[in-house]
């Protein structure tokens, strides 16, 4: 009997600790708020941000990214074709994948549908160079998501111990100004890193069969290779996609928020397809 994978479900109305603090502050007298604002402004104006401070901050972010990179693998797909002379050739492509669960002796890897769609062969390469044949657990063509499974026992024990399952965050708590780290393939190469901040969180965005939230961030990403966004706790808050980019915000990276899609990802991980009615809402004036 196989065990099913479950991901925690999040409350859309949940707030981050800092949001809660802000809510409490609004109940205080206006005079206290003004005094606090003046004190903060004075402290910031007198603070000298040195190169050492900057290097220290980037060092911390680099450490978060390197830790998250332990969950990243390379998903290689092979497609049989023929050259101009009719000789058989195999076209291959590399994509980033993130290990999001380990169950029944298998690593379950979240990747992009482009990585496995119509592939004749799938190989997953781990950081030590070990390649393991993978199988598609399920694909969601609407969102461009896919889950690939590989037997964890085929990986050398020492390397298997290094692989870390990437936790899924409560992305409903993400707000503008939060610092994010991009892992996967933000530079177009798997195992690259990038840093940035959330510029805007778009709520109630119309998608097939419902509403979602989209993160916009000033962070380098590559949705063709695959980029996953993690918070400073090292948890995945979303993944980038060109399909969710707004025409009015083309200079920012756009990402689906993970909390909105945990139920779908859970179904894919357990081999079940995601059901859609195909309804896309529209504002009527």
Region locations from a protein language model:
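Conserved active-site neighborhood of the chymotrypsin/trypsin-like protease fold
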Residues: 49, 101-184, 188-189, 223
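C-terminal cap/linker of serine protease catalytic domains
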Residues: 236-285
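Gly/Ser-enriched beta-turn/beta-hairpin loop segments
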Residues: 84-91, 139-143, 155-160, 201-215, ...
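Terminal peptide-recognition signature
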Residues: 70-75, 97, 107, 111, ...
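A conserved glycine-rich beta-strand in the N-terminal activation segment of trypsin-fold
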Residues: 54-63, 79-112, 131-133, 165-167, ...
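Active-site region of chymotrypsin-like
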Residues: 152-165, 194-254
């Amino acid at each position: 009997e196989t065990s099913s994978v479950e991901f925690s479900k999040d409350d859309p109305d949940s707030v981050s600790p800092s949001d809660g603090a802000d809510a409490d502050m609004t109940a205080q007298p206006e005079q206290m708020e003004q005094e606090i604002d003046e004190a903060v402004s004075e402290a910031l104006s007198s603070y000298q941000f040195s190169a050492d401070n900057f290097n220290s901050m980037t060092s911390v972010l680099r450490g978060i990214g390197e830790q998250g990179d332990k969950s990243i693998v390379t998903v290689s797909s092979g497609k049989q074709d023929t050259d101009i002379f009719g000789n058989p050739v195999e076209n291959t492509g590399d994509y980033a994948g993130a290990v999001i669960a380990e169950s029944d002796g298998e690593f379950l890897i979240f990747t992009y549908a482009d990585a496995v769609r119509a592939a004749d062969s799938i190989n997953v390469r781990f950081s030590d160079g070990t390649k393991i044949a993978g199988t598609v657990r399920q694909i969601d063509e609407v969102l461009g998501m896919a889950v690939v499974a590989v037997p964890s026992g085929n990986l050398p024990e020492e390397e298997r111990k290094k692989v870390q399952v990437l936790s899924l965050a409560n992305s409903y708590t993400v707000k503008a100004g939060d610092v994010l780290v991009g892992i996967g393939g933000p530079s177009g190469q798997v195992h690259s890193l990038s840093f940035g901040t959330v510029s805007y969180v778009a709520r109630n965005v119309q998608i097939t069969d419902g509403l979602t939230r989209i993160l916009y961030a000033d962070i380098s990403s590559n949705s063709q290779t695959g980029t996953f966004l993690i918070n400073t706790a090292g948890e995945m808050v979303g993944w980038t996609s060109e399909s969710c980019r707004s025409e009015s915000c083309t200079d920012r990276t756009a990402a689906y928020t993970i909390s909105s899609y945990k139920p779908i990802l859970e179904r894919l991980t357990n081999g079940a397809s995601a059901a859609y009615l195909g309804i896309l809402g529209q504002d009527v004036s």
